[in-house]
Structure formats: structure tokens, C-alpha cells
Amino acid sequence: MDLELKNRVALVVGGKGYIGTAVADRLRAEGATVVVASRSAGDSPDSVAIDTADQASVDAGIARVLEQHGRIDALVVTAAPSAGTLDPARKSDPDQVLTAIDGKALGFLRVANAVLPAQRAAGFGRVVVVSGQNAYLSGNITASLRNTAVSVIAKNLADEAAGTGVTVNVVNPGTVTDTPSPEVRPGGPGDSSPQQIADLVAFLASPLSVVSGESISIAHRVLGQITI
């Protein structure tokens, strides 16, 4: 299926990471012009330095992409500190909670706020953020809140953009691994690979998708839990 991404400009924030690399590769395979954003841009002309924790860095990076390419048709945000950086012993520590929310949810908000005005002006845009199924799970306040906050922000942005041609959605993986297992544990989410995540992201980033305001689980959503 042609996703109609040929010659579209896609910015992948966190595009050097585990999931971000797969997303960037998938979008390139569809013919998109992909700009990869990370904290250090390197020498590639298709990369830009953006630190999502620093508003000035975000604004400068987005301005550079718009100057070079004229538009950002699709924004994909995969940048966030790894869950492995969270200290389980501090899962209810307010300082860790705030740091985690800033690193993931507010980092997304900073970038989205910088890109959305140009997308609205163009009458077209796709915003996709990769979060996680910890949003549905209790037991770790830090992990739950930083992912839930992403979904709340994305839904608000989607509603604000309703009717403008711009869509905003969240993709929530469970366990991400190169060798996903078909088995799903009770009380846990299913496995998915970076490439499987990238397939869903590419569709949501394409003109073919009119979905907006959704938080979509990839692989099995937490087994044994009903959320409406």
C-alpha cells in the first residue's frame, strides 16, 4: 500500500534511538525526506540538533528544518529517557516523577508547540508520539505518570487542531524487543519490535490516516484489563 509519503518532509525527534532509527528507516522507505533530530546533530545534512529539555534548542532546531525544507509534514517524537534510567526505589519520589514528566511529556509538548503553527498554516500535518503501556499500569508512579501525561497532552493538542487538517496521536508499545514473543503474561502487555512500531507510526504519519486524538496500543494491550 502506497502511504503517499513520497517527498513529504518528516522530522523524527529521537531518530538515532532504538525505535527512532526504525521509524526513520521506514519513512525513508516510503519516499519521505527524513530529518533526524537528536541532541548532537553530527555532520549529516539530514540531521538537526534538538534537546527537547531546552526550549531555545527546540525553537532553533525547528526553525532550521523549516528554513531548509519549507515545511514539516510529519512530526514523530520518540525521544525520552529510557525506562531503564528510572530508579525503582524512587518510583514515588516527587523529584524523580517531575524529572520524568519533563523529560518525556513536556519534551514532546515543547516540540509539538514549535511545529504545530506551521502545520496549521499549511492546512496539513501529522504528529505522532511514542509513549508506552505503563500508562495503563499501576505500581510505579513515575512510569505511569510520565506516559499518562503524554496521552493527556496529545489529546488536548488533537482537539485544539480539530478541523485544521492536523492530526495528533500516541502509539503505546509494551515490551520492545528485536525478537517479540507471541506470548502475553496476565497483567502485562505484549511484545513488539521497533519495525512493527515503525509500521504503525508510518501509517499515522501519512495522508491516508485521518485518526486523531487516539492513544493506540501496539501488540497486545495489557492482558486482563479493560479501559474505556
Which role does the model predict for each range below?
Residues R8, G70-A74, Q119-G132, G163-V166, ...:
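Active-site loop of short-chain dehydrogenase/reductase
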Residues V13, I72-P81, K104, V129, ...:
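Rossmann-fold scaffold of SDR-type NAD(P)-dependent oxidoreductases
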Residues K16:
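Conserved glycine-rich cofactor-binding loop
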Residues S44-A56:
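Rossmann-fold cofactor-recognition segment
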Residues A60-E67, D87-K91, D95-G103:
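Active-site Tyr-X3-Lys motif and surrounding loop/helix of classical short-chain dehydrogenase/reductase
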Residues R64-V77, A83-T85, T167, V210:
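A glycine-rich helix->loop->beta "capping" turn
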Residues P81-S82, P94-Q96, A100, A105, ...:
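Catalytic loop of short-chain dehydrogenase/reductase
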Residues G163-V166, V170, P186-I226:
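C-terminal helical subdomain
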